[in-house]
Amino acid sequence: MTPTVPELEFAQATAFESNVPPLFPGRAGPDDGADRLRLRLAVRGWARPLDLIAASNSPDDVMAILGALAAEVETAVQTRPNQWYLSLAARKRELARRDDAQLRAAASASVPGDDDDPVLHAMRIALADAEPTLSALGTDVLAALGNACDWLGERWRHAVGAQRIAGELASRALDADLRRMTRDPMVGRSHRDTLARLIGFATAATQTPLSVAYVYGGGGAGKTTLLSFLQRDLSQRAEPVPVVRIDFDEPAIDPTRMVTLNIALVEQLARSVPAVCDRASDMLPALRDTALVQHDAGLSRGGPRKRIKSSRPESMLKAESVASQAASDEGSILYRLLAPDVVAGPILIVFDTAELVLAQSDHVASSLVSWLGFLHNEAGARDLRLVIAGRDPPDDPDLGHAANSLLSRLKDTGARIETPIGLPELDPAEAQQLLRNCGVDDPTAAAEAAAAVPGNPLLLRITADALLQGEAELRESVRRAHRDSRIDADSARNYLLRRVVAHVRDPIARPYVLAATYSPVVTAKLLEEVVIPAVDRSEREPGPGIPANKKAATAKAKRVFDALASTYWLTRQTLRSETVPFNREIRAFALKLLAATPEGALLERDVRQSAAIHHLRRRSADDRALALYHLAVLGHPYTVPRDLASVQTVLRDVIEELPADLRNRLAPPVGSVAPGVARGVARSSIDDMSDSDWQRYLEGDERSKRAGEGAQMVKADRAREALDLYLARPTRPPGLPPTFVIQAQADLGEWDEGIADIDAILEREADDWLARKSIGPEALSRIYWITRLALQAYGRLSTPHAMLLRNASETATGPGLSTLPALIAVAETMSGEPIMAGRMRSQALKTDAAGRTLLCPIHGHLPETIELFDAGIAVVQSDWRQRMIQLAPARLIRANEAHLRDLQSRLDALHAKPIAQVNQLFNKMRTGIAVEPTTMAGLNSAVLLLRGLTPEFYRPLREALLALCENGVASPMMRHAVDPLFERMSIRPAEMEPATFYRRLSNNPNAWCTAFIVYADRCRLLPGLCESLARYADSPKSRRIASSFLAWDKALCRGTSSDWGQPAKTRK
C-alpha cells in the first residue's frame, strides 16, 4: 500500500530524530538522499525510513526524499506504523545495479531495529564469503535467506542454494507439525493396533516390489493423527524409512499429471535422503519446467463440469506431442533415483484422502497405478510400500467402488494387498482419555462428554475446546447438554464448519452447504427455489449477496451447485450432470450434528417443507420419491406410489431416516441400483449402466462441459484402453463413433478396422456443420480427426470431404483458423488441388502451420516476409548451421548470424546429456526469424527452412515400432531399422546411445519408442527409418504406417525427401 499524506507529514515533522551517518561523505540533496534511502531499504525488511535518512537533511529534503520513494514501498499502517518495506520489483532493481561493496556498506550501517530484522541478517549472510550453516539459523532468518537468494539471482555466491534452503524450511515445518500431532499419546486400542500394523507393514522384509495397505475412516476419525505417528516412528529409526505423502487436497497435486506427483516425491525425499538431496537442485527445475509446458499445453485436470482444455482443437497437437514425451522426459530426469544403491530399504508412499480424486474418474486410478509403475521401471524403485488413507470401506457396495477400483488395478499389477483396516469410533473410556489429554481434568465433565458425544476424535477435541476455552455461560451450556446425553450445539457447529463447510472452496457456496444436506441429492433448481431462499430467510438481515432478480438467482444457484459438485469429499460424482448426491455417511453424521443446534431444527422444517412442494410440482419418479421422503420425515400425510421399485432405488441411502411403517414397506433389498438421481459413477459398471448413463460416462456431457472417460484416456495417451472400452459397448451406430474413437484409431495406426466410416460421417453430419454460422469446437475437432485419419489411411480426401474443408476454411473463425491449415496443406500437396481459402491462408502464415502452407506449390502469390520461430527451423544435427549457410538466403544468415551461432552451440551441448534437455531447450525457443520466401534458392532451401516436424505421426510410428518388439525386446527387424539412425545422429543424447536405449526400452517400451520417434524427427531422420520399415518390416501394420509417413513427406517436399542423410560432422 502506498504511504499516505499524514505519514509523509509525520515523517517531515520528526525528521530531526534521524542520526544515521551518510554512506558516502559529502552534502547530498533530495535526489541523492532518495538513492541512499532506497539502497538501505533494499537490504532490510520492515524499517522506519526516518531512521535511515541522514540527520543533515532539512525537513524539506526529508519530505522530498520520502515523496520520491512513496510509490516504491509497501506499508502496513495498522500493524507496522511508520515502517516501510521496499517492493519486490524496486528491491531487485536496486540490488542489481549496486556492487557488492555498496551492498555490504548499506547492510553494515546500524540503526534502531536492525538487530531484530531477519532480512538484514539474511542479506549480511548472503553477502559474506563464509558458507552459511543452515541448521544454525533461525527459521525467520532462513526464510529471508531464501528470498535473498532469489533477489540476488546470479550474484548468489554460496554453494547452498534456494533448493537446499527450501528443503530445510520444509523439514522444520514437517518436524513442527509432527511434534504437534504426536504431542499426546495415541488414544484407542484399535488406533494403536493399526499403528503397530502399519509400522510392521512399512518395515518388514518383503520380496514384492509394491505392497499396499488401505486404512479408512470417516472425517475426523483420526487418519491424519495415525499417519503422523507412523511418519514420526519411521523417521526416528536407526535405519529411517523415507516417507512421501501425496495429499490430494493440495491444489498442486494432479493425479492425471505424473509430473506433479514426481515434484512432490523429489521435494520430500530431498529432506531425508542425502543422495536425492544432491540431485534435487538439478531435477526440480527440470521437473517444474516440464510441468509448466504440460500446463500450457492444456494437460491440467478438468473438473467434472469443466471441459478439458486440450479437447479443443487449437491445442490438440501441442497437447498430443507433450503428453507423448512426458514419460520419457521424466524418466530421463529421474532415472534410477530410487534404485537400491541410492535409497536403501523401503520407501513409504501415502495417498491421503484418496476419494478426493478417485471419485472424479476411473481414469484417475489408472493414472496413479501408471505412476507407481513408472517409479519401478524408470526410477528403479524395488521396494515401495503404499498406504492409502480413505474415507469409505472398499467392501461397501455403495461407497467403496472408487477404493476398490484402485485396489483391483494394483492387484492386477502384482502388488501385495493387505487386508483393509477400518478406524472405529472411540469407546467411552477411550473418549475420556482423549478429553483428559486435551486438558479436561474434571473427571465428571469428561465422563459426561464421553457418554454424550460420538467417539469421533476430532469432534471430541472440539468438545474439549468448548469445555476449556468458552465463557462461563457457554461452558455451562455445554455441560448441561452433556448431562442430558446430547451433543452440545457449540461443538456440533464447530465440527460442521471445520469438517464439512470448510471443504467447499467457493466462499459464496459455503453458507448453503448444511441446508443442502437435508436433501439426499441436490439440483441447481432445488438450490435456487428451496435451499438458498431458506438460508437467506434465516438471516436477520439480508446479505449483499442475495440476488435481485431471477437471472442473478439462477446464476448464484449454478455457482453453489458447481461448488458442491466439485467437493468430492462431501458429494459423489453423478453421470447425470444436473444432479449431485451427497456421500451417505458424511450426510448422516452432518444431520445428526445439525439436530443438536437450535437453528438446525428451524432450518430443517423450512427446507423440507419447501423441498416437498418443489418435488410435488414435478412429475418424474425421482421427484415423487423425494416428495414422499420429505413429507414422511416431517410427519405429514403421504401416499406411497404403486411402483415401489423406483422409490426403493431413489431412497435407498435414506431409508433409515423414514418412519418405521414406511421403512418396513420399503425394506426389501434392491439387487441393483437403477440409474436414478442418487446413482453416480462409483456404483456403475459397463453391464448395469443404462444406455444414456453409459454414453454420458464414455463421451461426456457437452451441455454441462463434462469430459468423457474416453476423451480423457486418449488425451493421456491411452488410446488402446479407450478404444477397447468403446468396442465393449458402442454408443453410436456402426461407422459413426464419437470423436475420441476416431482419434484413438489414428493414434494406434489401426486405420482399416471398420470402426469409423468417414464417408458415412460426412453424409450424415456435413450438412449440419455447413449450415451453421460458425463451426463450434466439438464439430471442429471432429472435422480435424476425420481429415487426419483419411490422409493417414488413404493419402487423399473424397470430393465431399474436400468441399467440406473448402467451405470450413471460408467460414472458420477462432480456433479453426489455426487448427486446419496444417492438414489442409497436406491434402493440397497430395491432391494438387486448391482447398484453403485466402483468409485462412493469411492466418496460417502467422502460426506454426506457416512452413507447410508455404511448401504447398498451388498458391502462386507469396508474401514478402513471414516470421518463423527458431524452434520450427532448427534441426538437432551438428552441421545444421553449416547447411543453413549453404542453403538459406544470405540476408537471413547475415541478420541472424549471432543467434544461429548461439543456437548451434546450444544444440551441440545436448550431446551425451539427458534427452529431457532436448525438449526443455526447444520448449524455450521462441525467437522469431524473418524469412523472405521469394529469396529461397530452390527446393532444398525451402525444405530446410519450412519442413518442420510431423507430430501427427509420433503415436502411429510408435505403434509401428512396438509391433516389432515383444515385452520390450527389440526384434532383429527393429534393430535393422533403428541402428543406422543412431549412427546418423551427430548429436546424440545419453539415452540414444544404442546400449542405453535398448536397456531403457526393455523397462518402458511405450515411452522409449515414442522418445526415439520424436528425437529422430528433430534430427530429420524419420524418412530413412520409414524407408526401412516400409521395405523390410514383417508387420503389415508397421509397413502401412511407414508408407503413409513417406507419402506425407514426399508430398510436402514436392517429390523429394526431407531426410537429413549423413551429417557432415559425426560424433562418437
Curated annotation (Swiss-Prot):
Its Enzyme Commission number?
3.6.4.-
Q: Entry's InterPro entries?
A: P-loop_NTPase
Q: What are the alphabetically sorted keywords of the record?
A: Antiviral defense, ATP-binding, Hydrolase, Nucleotide-binding
Provide the residue positions that the database annotates as binding ATP.
G217, G218, G219, G220, A221, G222, K223, T224
Annotated GO molecular function terms are: ATP binding; hydrolase activity
Q: Which cysteines are joined by disulfide bonds?
A: none
UniProt GO BP: defense response to virus
What exactly does this protein do? Involved in defense against bacteriophages. When this probable 4 gene operon (bGSDM-FE772_23060-FE772_23065-FE772_23070) is inserted into E.coli it provides nearly 100-fold protection against phages T5 and T6 and about 8-fold against phage T4. The operon without bGSDM no longer protects against phage. Probably a nucleotide hydrolase, possibly of ATP.
Q: What is this protein called?
A: Probable ATPase FE772_23070
Instruction: Supply the source organism for this entry.
Output: Lysobacter enzymogenes
